Amino acid sequence: MTKTIAINAGSSSLKWQLYLMPEEKVLAKGLIERIGLKDSISTVKFDGRSEQQILDIENHTQAVKILLDDLIRFDIIKAYDEITGVGHRVVAGGEYFKESTVVEGDVLEKVEELSLLAPLHNPANAAGVRAFKELLPDITSVVVFDTSFHTSMPEKAYRYPLPTKYYTENKVRKYGAHGTSHQFVAGEAAKLLGRPLEDLKLITCHIGNGGSITAVKAGKSVDTSMGFTPLGGIMMGTRTGDIDPAIIPYLMQYTEDFNTPEDISRVLNRESGLLGVSANSSDMRDIEAAVAEWNHEASLAYEMYVDRIQKHIGQYFAVLNGADAIVFTAGVGENAENFRRDVISGISWFGCDVDDEKNVFGVTGDISTEAAKIRVLVIPTDEELVIARDVERLKK
């Protein structure tokens, strides 16, 4: 038995989960927030308890030190060296990293070079790796990429219809995201259906504040909705998803809101989607509450959101030449039963149908009617477990 920790480092946060492997038992989990700011918050959850402390944490190295000391303080481990492996989520692996990789040689430098593709994420992910390397230099460190699962896409799916030089010189292509989640729920869907993953065609829908949909054939991603960045694809909580690119130069010319690249990124990534259309909230719970009060903008935002998701699911029926199941996961996908019902009701002619008695909050598994030809599944995602499994697989 070994202890492995899965890490998701953000620019000012550190989310973690400690596993006993190979049993895959969660021993503890936690979150450190406001790194680099005053009144940082460290939360540790274990054995049904939740312990929190407020202190000033200057950087990721100090955050990792506090995390490790808390594990000892709460008697979860006796010493640092009980942890034999650490896995780090990294958003962008580009074309270079096609699978999870042990951190050695120039791996970390390559991760930092790929910050051009994920400037908000990769630098923070790399900071988390460096912090653990400093404090636990002798254990196996593994980087697990959101994009790796999508490197199986054929060229016709990942290339954009731009002049070739922008691909060869600037690496402009579809990379996708949420790959670890799509990979996990595809595997769980095969177990639930009692069929080999290699025999299945699945449409996996990771729908949270950010969202993406993936066509999975024989366990491999063959197309996905997010593109060069996580801005592409379906409408999301605060992101536009796909729009006509000509809108950008038009608004640059005729408004004061699009003067710089930073302005463009802010509006498209943080001020659009459900939030932008509803002028209310990016949270599906707030949107549904406003819809119930006959709020027109919220109703329109909800209808647009469902519409874009239905269109992408339909598109992937064409890509896969049919599907065996549609899988919902992540915050909205797992918890918003009205949303699932409305998405499926609009594409029921494919042969999918939701049983209202099964489609309730908190229920997971197969929510289809008995007569449905295509199964509709709700499967909680577990990206941290995928990371822990990859660490175990790659340990020396």
UniProtKB/Swiss-Prot annotation:
Belongs to the acetokinase family. It is found in: Cytoplasm. GO terms for molecular function: acetate kinase activity; ATP binding; magnesium ion binding. Homodimer. It comes from the Bacteria. GO terms for biological process: acetate metabolic process; acetyl-CoA biosynthetic process. Its EC number is 2.7.2.1. Pathway: Metabolic intermediate biosynthesis; acetyl-CoA biosynthesis; acetyl-CoA from acetate: step 1/2. Catalyzes the formation of acetyl phosphate from acetate and ATP. Can also catalyze the reverse reaction. CDD domains: ASKHA_NBD_AcK_PK. The gene is ackA. Pfam families: Acetate_kinase. Mg(2+). Can also accept Mn(2+). GO terms for cellular component: cytoplasm. Its cofactor is Mg(2+); Mn(2+). NCBIfam families: ackA (TIGR00016). The active site is at D146. It catalyses: acetate + ATP = acetyl phosphate + ADP. Keywords: ATP-binding, Cytoplasm, Kinase, Magnesium, Metal-binding, Nucleotide-binding, Transferase. Mg(2+) binds at N8, E383. Its main location: cytoplasm. This is Acetate kinase. It comes from Streptococcus pneumoniae (strain JJA). Coiled coil: none annotated. Substrate binds at R89.
